[in-house]
Curated annotation (Swiss-Prot):
GO biological process: lysosome localization; vesicle-mediated transport
Cross-referenced Pfam families: KxDL
Function: As part of the BORC complex may play a role in lysosomes movement and localization at the cell periphery. Associated with the cytosolic face of lysosomes, the BORC complex may recruit ARL8B and couple lysosomes to microtubule plus-end-directed kinesin motor. May also be involved in the biogenesis of lysosome-related organelles such as melanosomes.
Source species, domain of life: Eukaryota
Protein name stated in the entry: KxDL motif-containing protein 1
Subunit text: Component of the BLOC-one-related complex (BORC) which is composed of BLOC1S1, BLOC1S2, BORCS5, BORCS6, BORCS7, BORCS8, KXD1 and SNAPIN. Associates with the BLOC-1 complex. Interacts with BLOC1S1. Interacts with DTNBP1/BLOC1S7 (via coiled-coil domain).
Length: 177
């Protein structure tokens, strides 16, 4: 039934004769070149992704460290301004004639002007606990440990101090004279 000149053989023979082997080889070579390029590109993207991940981790740690530093500085400044307000109040009570021309509202400033809500501090503390990251690089120091800053941790919050001397020290010196 199958003769050598059957229709299927003739069709396949003519179909194969239409395909140029040089063109097929050129297509295969082009596909191999593209595959090599895609593999190199993929490797470069993986390296870039890994490097970006490492840099993100480093920057996140530095950001958290700087955020903690800013929160500490804000807390210190709040304490300083509270002491200044207390000192102003005491001076206003001791020397009312010197403060008579200043309106009462400017002597006792409210803390309502705080632009940073307390929820941000809570968020920072929570994110620090979850990441557990800490930047210990020596090039960035906390302001409380820097040489130019005075350590005020030994002073009670209710006692204002000027240049390391409390107001009560000055009063005792004036009494002795």
């Amino acid at each position: 039934m199958d003769t050598p000149d059957s229709a299927s053989r003739v069709f396949c023979g003519r179909f194969l004769s239409m395909v140029n082997t040089d063109d097929v080889n050129a297509i295969i070579l082009a596909q191999k070149n593209m595959l090599d390029r895609f593999e190199k590109t993929n490797e470069m993207l993986l390296n870039f992704n890994n490097l970006s991940s490492v840099r993100l981790q480093q920057m996140s740690e530095r950001f958290m460290h700087h955020t903690r530093t800013l929160v500490d500085m804000k807390r210190d400044l709040d304490s300083i301004f509270r002491r200044i307000r207390t000192l102003k109040g005491k001076l206003a009570r001791q020397h009312p004639e010197a403060f008579s021309h200043i309106p009462e509202g400017s002597l006792l400033e409210d803390e309502d002007e705080d632009p940073v809500p307390p929820s941000i501090t809570t968020t920072i503390a929570t994110s620090e606990q979850s990441t557990g990251s800490c930047d210990t690089s020596p090039d960035t120091a906390s302001p409380s440990f820097s040489p130019g800053f005075e350590d005020l941790s030994h002073i009670r919050p209710g006692s204002p101090a000027i240049n390391g001397h409390s107001q009560t020290d000055d009063e005792e010196e004036t009494r002795e004279e």
